[in-house]
C-alpha cells in the first residue's frame, strides 16, 4: 500500500511529470513502478538491458524516472548508462533468476561498454532515461543499503502493450491528459530530443 501512495503523491511526481511531458507529450500513463533495494555488501549486478524489451510499447514512447531514496554512488551500485546506443532495440537474451526457473530477466549478451558513464545521485535526486537507453548496475560494496523507486511512463495515446492485459485497469492509471503546452515538444521521440545530449 505504501508504493502506490508514494508514486501518486504530488511531492514525488509533479515535477517529474513535467519533464516526462517534454519528452513524450501531454498524455502520460504510469505502466510500472517498483522499489529497488540493494542490501549492504550484496545486492548483485543487474546486467545491461533496455527497458522496452520488457514493456514493448509502440514507437518506443516510454520514459523511466529513477528516484534515489539514498545517496547512490559507484561503490553502492549506481546505474551506469551507455551513450550512443539508444537509437534501436538491441538483441536481448532471457536468463533465469534462480535454478528453479521461477523468475527471469533480460540482458544484452554482448555490448562494448568502454564508454559507459556512472549516474551518481544524491538522496532525493533522480535520473530520467529513454526506454532504449542501455543501463546496468553493479554490486553494492558498502555497509549501507541502496534504495530507489523506479517509475515507468508511456505515451497514453499508444496502444496498450501486452503486459497491461494481465493487470487490473486501475493498476496503470493515466496521470495526465491535456492539450500540449506552448514550447513542449512531445511530438518527437525521446531519442530524437536527446540525440545530441547523450
Protein language model features and the residues they cover:
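Short, surface-exposed loop/helix-turn segments at secondary-structure junctions
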Residues: 50, 99-115, 145, 163-170
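Double-stranded beta-helix
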Residues: 72-134
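Non-heme Fe(II)/2-oxoglutarate
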Residues: 94, 126-128, 132-198
